[in-house]
Amino acid sequence: MSEFVTTSAGDRVAYDRRGDGPALIFVVGAGPWREVDPDTTRTAELLADRGVTAIVYDRVGRGESAVEGVITLERELAAIEALIDVVGGRAALCGHSSGCSISLRAAVDGLPVAALALWEAPLAPPNSGAREWADEVNRRIDAGENAAALDEYMKDMPPEILEIVRSIPAMIEQAPSLRPDGESLAWAESAPHAQLFGGLRIPVLAMVGEATYDIMTPAAESIAAAVPGASWKPMPGSEHGWEPEAMAAELAAFVHATHAADPVARATAR
């Protein structure tokens, strides 16, 4: 059964909590919510078996986290902050796709993020057009053109994926929740990554699937080069998704190692 937390922005966010141990919060990318994302839930279940508190939540404006008004990046960050409070005040974040740029922004903005595990961050080099693209997505959202906003957001995805996404009515209904994704990606391309992320002093692991899109490996390499001590690696996965067993094993090792080396996290857990 879902649990709920109210954020500082007044939004009621639904989440599942599993396991007992150092915490990790999954931050999904554009579109998914718990009901249609079994791989993230399965990964959380496997993490719980490995001594990790795993949080899977419905992003603001999706699933059981329904809201009114403009869904800003700030509201999404407030949701992450509230969930960090739920698990004791400090947590690792696992971003997926544009959830990576949201997670990076959370850490850069000073939320109590213990570590970042980033799966296939779709970050292009600076000034690659993300600002203009996000503005167009936002324009269509503001005009009430949800289907057009979804099409614009996913215009660079393979047509067969867009066809699947458009076949799910809730994806179109929840298109306003894409604004934080676009805004975070535009921010992540607004300057060199070393300038944006280079001040982070937390463990960062960027991952890509062994079969992935052309943009993903250079992005992972760039993140690893930008953040002191960060690393990247290929993992079992394809078509932008991971394999739950392998991902859970990797995340559990990462979270436990991070926790063991982080005196703030250990103090928070007591």
What do these predicted ranges mean?
Residues 4-64:
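Conserved HGGG/HGGXW glycine-rich cap/lid loop of the alpha/beta-hydrolase fold
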Residues 44-49, 56-91:
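Active-site loop/oxyanion-hole signature of alpha/beta-hydrolase fold enzymes
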Residues 58-62, 122, 236-238:
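Short beta-to-alpha linker loops that shape the active-site pocket of alpha/beta-hydrolase fold enzymes
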Residues 95-100:
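Conserved alpha/beta-hydrolase "nucleophile elbow" surrounding the catalytic nucleophile
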Residues 101-143:
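Flexible "cap/lid" loop of the alpha/beta hydrolase fold
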Residues 144-182:
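Conserved alpha/beta-hydrolase catalytic His-Asp/Glu region
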Residues 170-225, 233-244:
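Conserved serine/cysteine hydrolase catalytic core
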Residues 228-270:
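Catalytic active-site module of serine/aspartate enzymes centered on a nucleophile-bearing elbow/loop
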